[in-house]
């Protein structure tokens, strides 16, 4: 499968989620990735942490790490979904070298 790239994504969410809501949120986004032909999807909750500075009036946030493989052309749609989600404070997507 040529053109497949491995990605590692870290997402910072508002602290408003309890554990079950956080799992549901992560599951929904993993399903979106799957619908965009992503594979090897793994979701890891990194817990709630204090932030070094305020972001959108938030001093704490929940961190989620998502690893997946996908073709780069599908990434733009996923990024736009994240940008419009009011619960997402920040996110970073990195190419993961094999």
What are these model-predicted stretches?
Residues 1-61, 69-98:
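Long, contiguous binding/interaction regions
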